[in-house]
């Protein structure tokens, strides 16, 4: 089918392209949207739930996995996470001892098939809001900043989480799952869907906040500002009680190592948790007003 445009339509389209291009290149307005991760960022201090599920799923096949083998890939789409774990030399070696061969793609599918129902059972046990979430939401609403989210959870998983979070006062404007786009993190597609759904443009008017390197890479690939959370999430990997019981010097050293990791990944800013991000949003707005882009 061929579409014909008259001269007026062509001129209007060209004007629109120029307007959009100018807005993108010269944007100096306020932050218009914040895109938040879920586990380790807004709920489940320490990102404990997913770690427990991966451990139980592999145990069902007679293979033990440790926290580091799980957490290094946190933030990816869950099936991609499983696949990446099976490619680890030490883990594949333990699999070989049990099964007499290296893990293959069918094994990845079989492990993931166990993860889905396990996650459905566990996710609501780890749905408590992280301190600062409600205050952040209130402040963002007051500034007319829209709230989106991206997650490695599937839609059935996150719907249970959303219900628990809503009961505690957190309800983002939109939720995009990695299973709803062609590729999850570090690809930017979930952020782009958020932008379209929220009707926010340009991407430099948006901030991605998360607790994994994959979150940072996702935001950077989408052309957004990024804030990495060092204490509340996957990288430290401790519950709130465990984290707060650490000796101050030990905690400070651990958080600095995590912050360096995020900065190496390209994060514009780091914070211990969402309770510290409001001043950073104000600083980003100041930089935007001066013509700085992410």
Can you name each region flagged by the protein language model?
Residues 1-32, 134, 138-139, 154-294:
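Asp-based, Mg2+/Mn2+-dependent phosphohydrolase catalytic module
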Residues 2-20, 24-134, 138-143, 159:
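N-terminal helical cap/lid subdomain that shapes the substrate entry/recognition surface
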Residues 74-75, 151, 270:
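A structural signal for short, well-ordered beta-strand elements
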């Amino acid at each position: 089918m061929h579409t014909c445009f008259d001269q007026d339509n062509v001129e209007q389209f060209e004007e629109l392209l120029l307007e959009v291009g100018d807005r993108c290149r010269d944007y100096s307005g306020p932050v218009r949207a914040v895109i938040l991760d879920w586990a380790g960022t807004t709920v489940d201090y320490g990102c404990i739930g997913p770690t427990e599920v991966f451990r139980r799923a592999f145990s069902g096949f007679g293979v033990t996995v440790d926290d580091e083998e799980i957490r290094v890939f946190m933030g990816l789409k869950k099936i991609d996470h499983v696949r990446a774990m099976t490619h680890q030399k030490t883990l594949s070696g333990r699999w070989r001892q049990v099964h007499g061969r290296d893990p293959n793609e069918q094994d990845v599918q079989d492990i993931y098939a166990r993860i889905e129902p396990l996650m459905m059972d566990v996710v609501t046990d780890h749905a408590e809001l992280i301190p600062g979430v409600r205050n952040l939401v209130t402040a963002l609403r007051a500034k007319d900043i829209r709230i989106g989210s991206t997650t490695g959870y599937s839609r059935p998983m996150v719907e249970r989480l959303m219900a628990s979070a809503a009961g505690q006062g957190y309800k983002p404007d939109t939720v995009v799952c990695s299973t709803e786009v062609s590729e999850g993190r570090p690809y930017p597609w979930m952020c782009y869907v958020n932008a379209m759904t929220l009707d926010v443009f340009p991407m430099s008017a948006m901030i991605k906040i998360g607790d994994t390197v994959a979150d940072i890479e996702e935001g950077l690939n989408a052309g957004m500002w990024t804030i990495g959370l060092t204490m509340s999430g996957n990288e430290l990997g401790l519950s709130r009680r465990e984290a707060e019981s650490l000796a101050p010097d030990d905690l400070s050293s651990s958080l600095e190592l995590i912050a360096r990791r995020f900065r190496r990944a390209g994060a514009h800013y780091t914070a211990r948790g969402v309770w510290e991000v409001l001043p950073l949003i104000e600083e980003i707005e100041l930089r935007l007003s001066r013509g700085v882009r992410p």
